[in-house]
């Protein structure tokens, strides 16, 4: 979370505090709505959050996307003199044995300190992933719309044609989802609409199969 509530007070996270200090302590504000936190603002940077003050992290890549330096090299003065000039420096452990590793989309052993680095990078470059009440509304509409289309279309098609139509709809939805994500940094739910479409297709297919079997038995009888 970017903010933590404790005894009726709100406290900023490490990433927010570091960016605030790096930008020379500009205006820092918390934007609240009746349902909870809406966003955090640092100067003119508006950071979108969920109602709990959590940021959806836009990971820049796998571990060591950001430069790592060994403390031994620093103590031995083996680094360039300007290695840390005008940089935000995070000090933390990255060894597996210290258990400060987290599961992320890029790795199951992602150093916790580099997660903070990703958050800081997101804030400074305003490179946020969007998942708001609007996108949640779109998610619901997608479930209803694709469900209705399949529910109306599949019963009117032959089995092979229906299977092709269902596959094309699912493929189109996946392509649109990825396009929106990579083009607009907007996260639309992929799982629930796909489950809905698969369930409706399988349900209708199974229903028609047993219906045809009953009709065949009647004809034989």
Where do the protein language model's features map onto the residues?
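Flexible inter-domain connectors and hinge/loop segments
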Residues: 1-148, 186-194
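Transmembrane alpha-helices and their extracellular/periplasmic helix-loop junctions
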Residues: 122-221
């Amino acid at each position: 979370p970017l903010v933590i509530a404790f005894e009726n007070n709100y406290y900023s996270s490490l990433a927010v505090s570091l960016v605030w200090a790096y930008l020379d302590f500009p205006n820092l504000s918390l934007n609240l709505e009746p349902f909870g936190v809406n966003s955090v603002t640092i100067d003119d940077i508006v950071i979108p959050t969920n109602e709990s003050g959590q940021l959806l992290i836009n990971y820049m890549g796998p571990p060591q996307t950001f430069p790592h330096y060994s403390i031994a090299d620093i103590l031995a003065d083996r680094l360039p003199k300007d290695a840390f000039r005008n940089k935000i420096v995070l000090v933390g452990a990255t060894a597996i044995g210290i258990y400060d590793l987290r599961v992320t989309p890029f790795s199951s052993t992602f150093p916790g300190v580099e997660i903070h680095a990703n958050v800081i990078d997101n804030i400074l470059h305003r490179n946020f992933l969007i998942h708001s009440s609007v996108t949640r509304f779109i998610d619901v509409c997608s479930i209803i719309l694709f469900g209705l289309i399949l529910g109306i279309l599949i019963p009117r098609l032959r089995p092979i044609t229906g299977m092709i139509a269902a596959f094309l709809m699912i493929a189109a939805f996946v392509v649109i989802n990825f396009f929106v994500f990579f083009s607009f940094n907007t996260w639309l739910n992929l799982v629930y609409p796909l489950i809905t479409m698969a369930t409706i297709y399988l349900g209708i297919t199974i229903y028609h199969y047993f219906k045809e079997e009953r009709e065949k038995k009647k004809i034989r009888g």
